[in-house]
Regions:
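Short beta-strand-to-loop elements that line the ligand-binding cleft
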Residues: 58, 75-83
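Surface-exposed patches in mature extracellular/periplasmic domains of secreted proteins
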Residues: 78-81, 122, 164-168
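Short helices/loops that flank or line small-molecule/ion binding pockets
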Residues: 1-2, 46-49, 70-73, 85-108, ...
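A conserved helix-loop-strand patch within extracytoplasmic ligand-binding domains
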Residues: 1-56, 61
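Extended ligand-binding regions for polar small-molecule ligands
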Residues: 17-38, 131-172
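Stable alpha-helical elements in mature extracytoplasmic
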Residues: 43, 64-67, 84-87, 102-106, ...
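Periplasmic-binding protein-like
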Residues: 8-13, 104, 111-151, 172-186
Length: 186
């Protein structure tokens, strides 16, 4: 299998209780590419300072868990859960300070009545070890279908179709960043 260009680019972010000191993280609601070390490192250092000594809830065996452990290590208490719903119960009960998950999950969680006391905080992160780009797998050697899919996806990104649909259904702009070089090399 070979992936075409991504048709969506998700993000990961934090959820915490309204009024929590964690709710004041830098770059709240702004995109942060963790692969851009010059831009990301100062922000992640500040996020780490805010999270130091706090309990962060993540779903086990996810790229979100990997990121928390890689960036913050023993400075935070990383608590893992089998499901996001289990973790949501703990944050609303005050047993953890903050949770970290995909932005799409976060917007879905905030729409639930039982999560009315939660708020998104911190940057919308992508890159590094986060699994955020979503692409269609096409068999190797099938260059014609891949080229057609890539063309349609690029057009939908450029004309705003992906943005319109992703905001409608997930409340986030999931339009991928498509560079001309990346498109021709894939």
């Amino acid at each position: 299998m070979r992936a075409g260009i991504p048709y969506a680019s998700g993000v990961a972010t934090f959820l915490t209780l309204k009024g929590s000191p964690i709710a004041t993280m830098p770059m709240t609601g702004e995109r942060l590419n963790l692969n851009d070390k010059n831009a990301a490192d100062p922000v992640m250092t500040r996020v780490g300072e805010i999270l130091k000594g706090k309990t962060v809830g993540v779903v086990q065996s996810t790229s979100q868990e990997q990121l928390i452990r890689a960036y913050f290590g023993s400075d935070v208490d990383t608590r893992t859960y089998k499901t996001s719903a289990e973790r949501d119960l703990d944050i609303t009960a005050g047993r953890i300070d903050v949770e970290f998950d995909s932005g799409v999950y976060a917007t879905t969680a905030l729409a639930k009545a039982e999560n009315q006391d939660l708020i998104m905080t911190g940057p919308f992160m992508r890159g590094a070890m986060l699994a955020t780009d979503v692409a269609l797998g096409i068999r190797k050697g099938e260059t014609e279908p891949k080229a057609k899919f890539d063309e349609v996806i690029r057009a939908a990104a450029e004309d705003g179709t992906i943005r319109k649909l992703s905001v409608k259904w997930s409340k986030l702009d999931l339009t991928p960043t498509l560079s001309p070089a990346a498109a021709s090399s894939q």
